[in-house]
Amino acid sequence: MKPLVAIYGPTHTGKTDLAKDLYSRFPSELISVDSVQIYKGFDIGSNKPDKKELQKYPHHLIDILDPNETFSVGDFKKRSIKILQDADKKSKLPIFVGGTMMYFYSLLEGLADLPERDDLIRAELECDLETFGLDYLFRRLEDLDPEAALVIHQNDRQRILRAIEVCLITNEKFSTIQKHAVKEKILKRKILTFAIVPQDRHQYKKELHERFKLMIKRGLIDEVRGCLLYTSPSPRDQ
């Protein structure tokens, strides 16, 4: 069994370049660990590799969902396990690269054993979201679990929905369940981690500013507008 390579750090630090270099040197599978690059259409803002680059360096978990589809940490874990199993069968080195630390945490540290998603409850919550808006759901979370509401941002749609869903499934507070849940350790292999951080923070901020200006020139604003139209958010949340 090959070790797992984990390359993580903030944006624009050379993570992808290192992953591509390793891919060129060893029989490998590249796995994106990015909660935005999984979506089609979020190309400029996520600094997604272009089609030509992806042909040369194919990545798992890029462009796998439409913008209106949901993807949880649990979904990432399940897909990653399958990719790891396939990589092992081919004797390939799995290289996980990206900046979504919660995804990495689910792999390296394990996830709390929470109840599976309930499609009926989730559909009802999605309906409430569309009808009444996210503020309404956040107030509902405050009523169900004030402690969870203190640590979940009021604009974090995914976590608000999940916390309420768990409360309704279990008739217990989400925060209480998290405290007592046993984490499921899924990896029993050697892990090689590369944490890439900028050495000169002043220069780093300057480069980020320049990259953002370039993104604007490339059409970032139109990209965001297109994604907002595609996802059709509730008027209350605009």
Name each model-derived stretch.
Residues 1-232:
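Phosphate/pyrophosphate-binding catalytic cores of soluble transferases and nucleic-acid-acting enzymes
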Residues 233-238:
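A short, hydrophobic C-terminal helix/tail in secreted or cell-surface proteins
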